[in-house]
Regions:
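A structural signal for short loop-to-beta-strand junctions that line the ligand-binding cleft
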Residues: 115, 122-123, 153-189, 218-221, ...
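Extracytoplasmic "Venus flytrap"/periplasmic binding protein-like
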Residues: 89-157, 164, 192-200, 306-309, ...
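Periplasmic solute-binding protein
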Residues: 136-140, 161-200, 225-250, 346-352, ...
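Extracytoplasmic ligand-binding clamshell segments of periplasmic binding protein
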Residues: 244-322
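C-terminal motif of bacterial Sec signal peptides marking the signal peptidase cleavage site
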Residues: 28-31
Length: 467
C-alpha cells in the first residue's frame, strides 16, 4: 500500500532488481527542499526553484498557455509537496499557465468524489493506486492521455510502467513517482555491536535478528498502526516465496486467500511476528506505532535505539532525515532478503490522471511524462522516478542513485504493490479489509487459518465474488 510520504505496481515480476541496494548504500541524504510559499506556484516563483529551470534543459516542447489556470491535487505534504510545487513552477515558467496545488486527503478517491459532486474537480490528480485509476475510469471521471503524452511515455518508460497506467487497454495514468518497497533499513551501530552482517536470505535475517536480540537491542520496529506497512511485509514474503505467477493471481483474486501459498507466507511472517521480544513494544506497541515513528525510533538513541531494523521503501529516507542519523553511515539499508529462490522487489508509485480535459491539462501530463519534470524533483532528494531517461547523476546521493539504477535496470521485470491493485475496500482502507486482517494477525500470529478465512471473506466482498 502507499506510504504517508508518497506514495507505491505492474503485471511483471521483480527479480532482477534484487541488487537494489547491494553493497554500502552510502552518503548522507540531501535535505528534501525547504519552505515553499504555499500561496504561490506560478511563474514568479519558478526562477527560485532549486534544481529547476534552465539548468534542467528541455526535452519536450510545450504550448504557450498564458491566461490559463490549472488545479493539481495530490495527498503529498511537507517537503514532498514543496518539491513538487517547484516542478509545477517550471511548467508555469515555460507555458505561462498558472498552476495551483490542491492538498488532498486519503483516500483520494473519496476526496475527489466530493470535489466532483460540488462541481469543482481539479484538472489533474496524482493517484497512488492502480485500483484508484480504475475506479476513476469506471466513474467516468478520468480522461485518456493524448498523443503528445503518449509519445513521451513510449520514449521514456518501460512497457510495464505504461501498462500499469492503462485501463481496458487505454492510457489514463502517467506514473510520475515510483517507490522501491523491498528494503530493510538498519541502525549501523546496533548491528555492528551485535557482530551481525547484512542478511541475504530469510534464514540469515532470522539469525541476524537473534544476534541483535542477544546484544540487548530489540531487532525490529514495525509501524503496525498503519496497516499498509503490514501488507508490504506480506507482499515481499509472498512474491519471493510463491513466485510472480501466484502473486498476479492473488492480486487479481484469481486464487483465494485460503490457498496454501498464503498459508506458507503467513507462517513465514509469524517466524518474526510471533516473537514478542523481536518487536519494539511487542505486538501491542507495534500496533500503536505509526510508520514515521517506526522509522525515527530506529535511528534515535545512538547505538541503543528502540529497534535495530525497520522494513519499508526508499521513502523512509525522508523520515530518517528528521533524526540526527546520516544515511550511509548511521543509517544503512539492504534489499529485502530472499525467502524463496530469489529476492523480491515490490514497487509502488503515483500516477497523474486528467479529470478535466483541456490543452493545458494534456500539456501538464506530457511534461510530467518527460525527463524534464522528473529531473527537477530528483535533484531535490526523497524521490524516485520510473522514467528511464532521467540521468542517474540527477539523484543527490549514492543511495538514491543505486536504488534508481536498479529500478530502471529491472525494465518490465517487476511487480506492483498488491494491495494497491486491489479494490480500495480491501487493500486501501484503514480499519478494514487486508489492513485490519493483518493487524489482527500481528496481534495473534498463531491463527493462520482464521486470518486466511477473514482475508478471503473480505476479498470476496470487495472484488465482487469468489475466485
Amino acid at each position: 500500500m502507499r506510504s504517508t510520504n508518497s506514495t507505491t505496481r505492474t503485471r511483471r515480476a521483480v527479480r532482477a532488481a534484487a541488487v537494489v541496494a547491494a553493497g554500502a548504500l552510502a552518503l548522507s541524504l540531501t535535505a528534501c527542499g525547504g519552505g515553499d510559499d504555499d500561496k504561490k506556484t506560478g511563474s514568479d516563483e519558478s526562477s527560485k526553484a532549486s534544481g529547476g529551470g534552465a539548468e534542467t534543459g528541455s526535452t519536450v516542447t510545450l504550448p504557450k498557455l498564458d491566461g490559463t489556470t490549472l488545479e493539481v491535487a495530490a495527498v503529498w505534504t511537507g517537503a514532498e509537496q514543496a518539491n513538487f510545487k517547484k516542478v509545477l513552477a517550471e511548467f508555469s515558467r515555460r507555458t505561462g499557465a498558472k498552476v495551483t496545488f490542491v492538498p488532498a486527503q486519503d483516500p483520494i478517491i473519496n476526496f475527489l468524489g466530493s470535489k466532483i459532486a460540488g462541481g469543482q474537480p481539479p484538472d489533474v490528480a496524482l493517484l497512488p493506486q492502480p485500483g484508484a485509476i480504475k475506479q476513476a475510469v469506471e466513474k467516468k471521471w478520468a480522461k485518456p492521455v493524448g498523443a503528445e503524452a503518449q509519445a513521451q511515455l513510449s520514449k521514456n518508460y518501460s512497457q510495464g510502467w505504461q501498462d500499469i497506467g492503462k485501463v481496458d487497454g487505454k492510457q489514463y495514468g502517467v506514473y510520475y513517482k515510483a517507490a522501491n518497497k523491498s528494503l530493510i533499513w538498519y541502525n549501523a551501530k546496533a548491528l555492528e555491536n551485535a557482530g551481525a552482517s547484512e542478511p541475504k536470505t530469510w534464514k540469515d535475517l532470522l539469525s541476524t535478528a537473534q544476534q541483535v536480540y542477544d546484544s540487548g537491542v530489540t531487532p525490529f520496529s514495525v509501524g503496525g498502526a498503519d496497516g499498509w506497512t503490514l501488507t508490504d511485509w506480506f507482499e515481499n514474503v509472498y512474491l519471493s516465496q510463491a513466485g510472480p505467477e501466484k502473486y498476479d493471481q492473488l492480486a487479481q483474486h484469481k486464487i483465494k486467500w485460503t490457498d496454501p501459498s498464503v498459508k506458507q507466507a503467513l507462517t513465514t511472517l509469524a517466524q518474526i511476528w510471533s516473537k514478542k521480544d523481536y518487536l519494539a513494544g511487542g505486538p501491542d506497541g507495534a500496533l500503536q506505532t505509526e510508520f514515521p515513528a517506526s522509522v525515527t525510533q530506529t535511528f534515535t538513541g545512538g547505538d541503543q535505539p528502540k529497534a535495530a531494523m525497520v522494513y519499508e521503501g526508499d521513502f523512509a529516507q525522508v523520515n530518517i532525515g528528521e533524526t540526527k542519523a546520516k544515511v550511509g553511515t548511521d543509517a544503512k539499508v539492504f534489499p529485502f532478503p530472499a525467502v524463496g529462490a530469489s529476492a523480491p522487489v515490490v514497487s509502488g508509485g503515483d500516477a497523474a490522471v486528467i479529470l478535466k480535459d483541456s490543452k493545458a491539462a494534456q500539456a501538464l501530463v506530457t511534461f510530467l511524462a518527460s525527463p524534464d519534470a522528473a529531473t527537477i524533483q530528483a535533484k531535490l532528494g526523497g524521490y524516485l522516478s520510473p522514467n528511464k531517461n532521467v540521468p542517474e547523476s540527477a539523484y543527490p546521493n549514492e543511495v538514491q542513485r543505486t536504488i534508481a539504477k536498479a529500478l530502471i535496470a529491472s525494465g518490465d521485470d517487476f511487480r506492483f504493490d498488491m494491495s494497491d491493485q486491489a479494490p480500495q475496500a480491501f487493500g486501501g482502507t484503514p480499519g478494514k479489509g487486508e489492513w485490519k486482517d493483518l493487524q489482527d494477525f500481528l496481534k495473534n500470529p498463531s491463527d493462520v487459518a482464521g486470518t486466511q478465512a477473514k482475508l478471503e471473506k473480505d476479498a470476496a466482498a470487495a472484488y465482487g465474488g469468489g475466485s
